[in-house]
C-alpha cells in the first residue's frame, strides 16, 4: 500500500506538504519522499528509508532545505519516489501508488521498442518510471 499528497498554494507549501504526507504514514513502511518546486531553486527532493524509523523523524531535519509553493509527497511500499523526469514536455516530479504484477513482461516489451529506464529500485525497474 501507500499514499500520496500534493499541494499548490499562493504561499509556501512545505508545512502543509510535510503534515499531509505524514498523515499517510500508516499506509506504508518502506520509503517516504518529498519534492517541492520553486522558481528560484527548481525541484528539491528528498527520499528516506522508513523501515527503521517514522516519517516525521526522518524528514524534520530536511524541512529547511525545501522551498516553493508546489509539492508532492509519498509513502511507498514499493519504490523510491518521487522521481524527477526531464522530457520534451518539461521537468516534473511524479509519484504513483501501484503494484504492477507483470512489470518484467512490460519492461521487456518496452526495451524491445528501444525505450530505456533510468530509475532502479532494489535492482528492478522503478514502476513509477514504467508507468
Regions found by a protein language model. Give the residues of each.
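Conserved short alpha-helical segments that host acidic/polar catalytic motifs at enzyme active sites
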Residues: 1-131
Amino acid at each position: 500500500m501507500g499514499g500520496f499528497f500534493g499541494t499548490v498554494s499562493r504561499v509556501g507549501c512545505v508545512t502543509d506538504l510535510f503534515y499531509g504526507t505524514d498523515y499517510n504514514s500508516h499506509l506504508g513502511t518502506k520509503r517516504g519522499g518529498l519534492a517541492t518546486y520553486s522558481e528560484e531553486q527548481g525541484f528539491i527532493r528528498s527520499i528516506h528509508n522508513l523501515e527503521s524509523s517514522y516519517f516525521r523523524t526522518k524528514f524534520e531535519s530536511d524541512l529547511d532545505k525545501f522551498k516553493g509553493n508546489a509539492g508532492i509527497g509519498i509513502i511507498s511500499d514499493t519504490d523510491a519516489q518521487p522521481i524527477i523526469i526531464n522530457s520534451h514536455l518539461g521537468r516534473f516530479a511524479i509519484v504513483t501508488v501501484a503494484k504492477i504484477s507483470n512489470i518484467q513482461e512490460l519492461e521487456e516489451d518496452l526495451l524491445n521498442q528501444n525505450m530505456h529506464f533510468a530509475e532502479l529500485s532494489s535492482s528492478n525497474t522503478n514502476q513509477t518510471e514504467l508507468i
